[in-house]
Design a protein with these regions (language model features):
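RNase H-like (RuvC/DEDD) metal-dependent nuclease/polynucleotide-processing core
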Residues: 1-4, 8-287
Length: 287
């Protein structure tokens, strides 16, 4: 099974591109990293996603992907703002807003709430240790949702747990992933990345070495072994001080975990069967 992971940027550039890791889930517990791709624009990324799976070569062109961006908003927020509570209608409404309108409405929502509880959370945020999907800064995941999810939907992929049965191309499956969840489980709160060159320290490099070693050995909560055949590729993962390439690889492993669950008969790819279909769920997070 072909698997992929995506470290997303809502405003990609040549310096800070969208990064994707492509690989293959072998029988057993091994995931082979085959290729790293970079996209300097949303249009280029969308064009890649929209490539249809070839029915005659489904094993080669079909994929299950883990994408590091939110796929939904907190139900509490949606209901408070009187937005549609059907996921598709809610996402249509959200896509039609400007970033400024999103920021203003979310800031007003937070301003009316007590200190310590400014943001609304999805049910998956706690188990995953993820930021609220309504945050517009540090990190701006609300804008990632706004920029990325409409392109996934336009590409016609299947979104388990969110779409109705039969919607989307079941040979191209997209799941919400979060690399920080696996990284913390392996190296705790050690920082392994920074977008600021001055903060890309030897200590963070050593944390990447430790994290990658756990992925390659299988000594991680997913019990999957990452195989990297090209030493050059391994060096690229370790040398990337931003951590984007390593994050894409972690998302790929989370997608592989989900693909294995599907192969065992789980139509929701390991997602909880009682998940909130408005909010969605981060793959591999335990309910």
């Amino acid at each position: 099974m072909r698997v992929l992971g995506c470290d997303f940027s809502s405003r990609p550039t040549a310096r800070k591109p969208i990064t994707m890791a492509l690989g293959h889930l072998l029988a057993g517990d091994t995931v082979v990293l085959q290729e790293l791709l970079e996209f300097a624009s949303l249009d280029a990324w969308a064009a890649w996603l929209a490539r249809p799976a070839d029915a005659a070569q489904s094993a080669q062109s079909a994929w299950v992907g883990g994408f590091d961006l939110p796929f939904g908003l907190p139900r509490e927020l949606v209901e408070q703002l009187a937005w549609p509570t059907d996921w598709a209608a809610c996402m249509d409404h959200y896509a039609g807003l400007t970033r400024q309108a999103i920021r203003e409405q979310f800031k007003a929502f937070c301003a009316a709430r007590p200190a310590g509880g400014k943001f609304a959370h999805r049910a998956t945020d706690g188990p995953a240790g993820a930021s609220p999907s309504m945050k517009w800064v540090n990190p701006p995941v609300a804008y990632m949702l706004h920029a990325g999810l409409p392109l996934l939907r336009a590409a016609g992929v299947h979104l388990p747990g969110l779409q109705r049965p039969g919607e989307g191309d079941a040979r191209r499956v997209a799941l919400e992933a979060y690399p920080g969840m696996l990284a913390r489980a392996v190296i705790g709160r050690l920082s392994y990345k920074s977008d600021e060159p001055v903060r890309q320290t030897p200590e963070r490099h050593q944390a990447r070495v430790q994290l990658l070693a756990a992925l390659e050995s299988g000594d991680n909560p997913l019990a999957l072994r990452l195989r990297i055949d090209a030493e050059e590729t391994r060096n690229q993962l370790l040398a990337d001080g931003s951590g984007d390439r390593l994050d894409a690889v972690i998302c790929m492993l989370q997608a592989a975990w989900a693909a294995a669950r599907r192969a065992q008969g789980d139509a929701l790819y390991g997602l909880p069967h009682d998940l909130d279909p408005l909010e969605g769920w981060i793959v591999t997070a335990q309910a």
